[in-house]
């Protein structure tokens, strides 16, 4: 183990995936519900993970019709991107044998809500700025190599660089 990354588990998965590519696939199936009661946060659902589940709630800020009683859906999305990048950075460092004594990450961006407010067609997102700060005995060159590997291997970065197909379905219930 290196800085809370279990390298033996990664090694075992790599070996498994070399024999069975499907072993690298992890399916996600999330569910949530819009709450119509004025006394409740607007949206909620359970998020399952290997050792349990967590209830997540979202509420729009007041200017989008909520009360700001919970993080917005976008805040979760951005936290997910930041967490994915940071986790990938720590994992790539461990896989390369680069020890991290400490790592902090910041994500900064602006969101233009004019489109969501019906004021025209505007790109809502422009520039994700990830800033990773590491304390390590590694050289700056090694840290930059880990950054490069992270940029190449982080699923969140990949999703921002490549259009991901999607489908939407709306069904009226009786």
Regions found by a protein language model. Give the residues of each.
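Extended beta-strand/beta-hairpin segments
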Residues: 1-79, 91-174
